[in-house]
Amino acid sequence: MRSFDDEHGGHWQAALLEASFGNVLLIFSRIGGEGVLHKALDTANYHEAEQWLAGSDEAALRTSLAEAKPWG
């Protein structure tokens, strides 16, 4: 799990979720807010997704957040 700030000063957490068929989702939740966003990661497996998340800077997380869709 990673915490970061968006360009408006909002505080977010990003976490990984193993989905069906080997897919990995990046899940975003705003700290103190409601709703959850998700984005499928283009990684081969969960381990690779963990490495991506650990190595991503805040700019990469903000870019993924901008591409994320509401859950549900």
Where are these regions (language model features)?
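Negatively charged, low-complexity tracts enriched in Asp/Glu with abundant Ser/Thr
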Residues: M1-Q13
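Residue-level signal for well-ordered alpha-helical segments
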Residues: S3-D5, R30, H38, D42
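Acidic, low-complexity intrinsically disordered segments
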Residues: E34-G72
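Short, surface-exposed, low-complexity cationic segments
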Residues: L17-V36
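Intrinsically disordered, low-complexity regions enriched in Ser/Pro/Gly/Gln/His and often acidic
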Residues: F4-D5, F21, N45, S64
